[in-house]
Curated annotation (Swiss-Prot):
It comes from Staphylococcus haemolyticus (strain JCSC1435). The lineage of its organism: Bacteria, Bacillati, Bacillota, Bacilli, Bacillales. Catalyzes the conversion of inosine 5'-phosphate (IMP) to xanthosine 5'-phosphate (XMP), the first committed and rate-limiting step in the de novo synthesis of guanine nucleotides, and therefore plays an important role in the regulation of cell growth. Coiled coil: none annotated. SUPFAM superfamilies: CBS-domain pair, Inosine monophosphate dehydrogenase (IMPDH). Residues 475-488 have a biased composition (Polar residues). Keywords: CBS domain, GMP biosynthesis, Metal-binding, NAD, Oxidoreductase, Potassium, Purine biosynthesis, Repeat. This is Inosine-5'-monophosphate dehydrogenase.
Length: 488
């Protein structure tokens, strides 16, 4: 032990390059899909971080539509986080199997509140909540000129000539019915009982986002962060009830007894939910979490742009080595790891994937997009969005202190492991994802990798020094026009 104290040398993204190989792979033909677990299949290997300036429902919806996954942060109340998950799960459906419904005796005000809360344009009306016999439908058109919202729904709903379809109707069949009758919502009934709903908006979204990441019911995938605090059990329960697909047990040090016990507890209670645990940076930690029941392990101690763990606590492993060591252990279990942090360019993504990551988690690269929840501000004539680490004072005061095992401390006693800052505004998420995945596709073409498994198994690295890094970036020239995928 003592003799080997300084034996390990570690590498990060700027220390290595992928070696080009013989290839018949065209970048546009590269397969970017990945299976993280039995129930989580993504069409791009990208996950947005569970940070309070990166991912809420708006980002999670946009990520899933691009084929990735969003992790809704936990710096909010339990009910609020569950509602954020519900917004994602209800934003897009092949067939809505559990549609919202109201009864004729409820008020128009209640209908307006429900439709506003979940941003829906109509709701089926049933005779009562037990029999659920369909008796009408209420849409925005029915409410357009209403002034007295205390009246009953029965006074304004559409009752006559309701257009319905039987359970089992396909989306193609539903589209024909909707277009023929010029309606937007098609209730699915069986013996008069409301059993489902298909909307024209959902059909349009299927056509607009053909590569969206969805569950077995055609709903967008959603993940949510939990911790190891006192409210974790009830938080997890509410998230599962809301339809979450993956629970991220998110801590700064995943190789700790509290996290391992939490993984065991969650996997035992929710075997159908994908359990992701982290963060770790060693093979031993990876093994411990997989043996505890984790489906996926998240790798990264201190590589993030807003993280100060390595300089405050003096702890961490440079990210490429951490990914490789953890992936080597994960291969023994036939399970996946997520490379979390330190990624500055699309080239870093493909390096992380080639080193053994099944997917990457991004914070700073996505924090400047339109869909992130960070506040927009103007500085020296340019637009920026606020971006902060979950170990920053502001985030810890809002609730992330348990991530750093400081739940019992008052704000004055917090020892932060992150900073608060700003990042340039980038516009819509889809533009950023397009550029990032374009870089990954290019790398797969250079390395002759038709899919991500081949990239993980066969791609080779070369080490480089500071001169090699300087040579890799533009040099001996003044950049006069910025590129959409490069800033330094």
């Amino acid at each position: 032990m003592w003799e080997n104290k300084f034996a390990k040398e570690s590498l990060t993204f700027d220390d290595v390059l992928l070696i080009p190989a013989a290839s018949d792979v065209l970048p546009n033909d590269a397969d970017l899909s990945v299976e993280l677990s039995e129930r989580i299949k993504l069409n791009i290997p990208v996950i947005s971080a569970g940070m309070d300036t990166v991912t809420e429902s708006k980002m999670a919806i946009a990520m899933a539509r691009q084929g990735g996954l969003g992790v809704i942060h936990k710096n909010m109340g339990i009910e609020e986080q569950a509602e954020e998950v519900q917004k994602v799960k209800r934003s897009e459906n092949g067939v809505i199997t559990n549609p919202f419904y109201l009864t004729p005796d409820e008020s128009v005000y209640e209908a307006e509140a429900l439709m506003g809360k979940y941003r829906i344009s109509g709701v089926p009306i049933v005779s009562d909540k037990e029999s659920r016999e369909l008796v009408g439908i209420l849409t925005n058109r029915d409410l357009r000129f209403i002034e007295d919202f205390s009246i009953k729904i029965s006074d304004v709903m559409t009752k006559e000539n309701l257009i319905t379809a039987p359970v089992g109707t396909t989306l193609d069949e539903a589209e024909t019915i909707l277009q023929e009758h010029k309606i937007e919502k098609l209730p699915l009934v069986e013996n008069g009982r409301l059993e489902g709903l298909i909307t024209i908006k959902d059909i349009e979204k299927v056509l607009e986002f053909p590569h969206a990441a969805k569950d077995a019911h055609g709903r967008l995938l959603a993940a949510a962060a939990i911790g190891t605090s006192k409210d974790t059990e009830i938080r997890a329960q509410k998230l599962v009830e809301a339809g979450v697909d993956a629970l991220i047990i998110d801590t700064a040090h995943g190789h700790s007894s509290g996290v391992i016990q939490e993984v065991k507890k969650m996997k035992e209670k929710y075997p159908e939910i994908t359990i992701v645990a982290g963060n770790v940076a060693t093979a031993e930690a990876t093994r411990a979490l997989f043996e505890a029941g984790a489906d996926v392990v998240k790798v990264g101690i201190g590589p993030g742009s807003i993280c100060t763990t390595r300089v405050v606590a003096g702890v961490g492993v440079p990210q490429i080595t951490a990914i490789y060591d953890c992936a080597t252990e994960a291969r023994k279990f036939g399970k996946a790891i997520i490379a979390d942090g330190g990624i500055k360019f699309s080239g870093d993504i493909i390096k992380a994937l080639a080193a053994g990551g099944h997917a990457v988690m991004l914070g700073s690269l996505l924090a400047g997009t339109e869909e992130s929840p960070g506040a927009t501000e103007v500085f020296q004539g340019r637009q920026y969005k606020v971006y902060r680490g979950m170990g920053s004072l502001g985030a810890m005061e809002k609730g992330s202190n348990d991530r750093y095992f400081q739940e019992d401390k008052t704000p004055r006693k917090f020892v932060p492991e992150g900073i608060e800052g700003r990042t340039a505004y980038k516009g819509p998420l889809q533009d950023t994802i397009y550029q990032l995945m374009g870089g990954v596709r290019a790398g797969m073409g250079y390395t002759g990798s038709p899919d991500l498994k081949t990239l993980r198994d066969e791609a080779q690295f070369t080490r480089m020094g500071p001169a090699g890094l300087a040579e890799s970036h533009p040099h001996n020239v003044q950049i006069t026009k910025e590129s959409p995928n490069y800033s330094f």
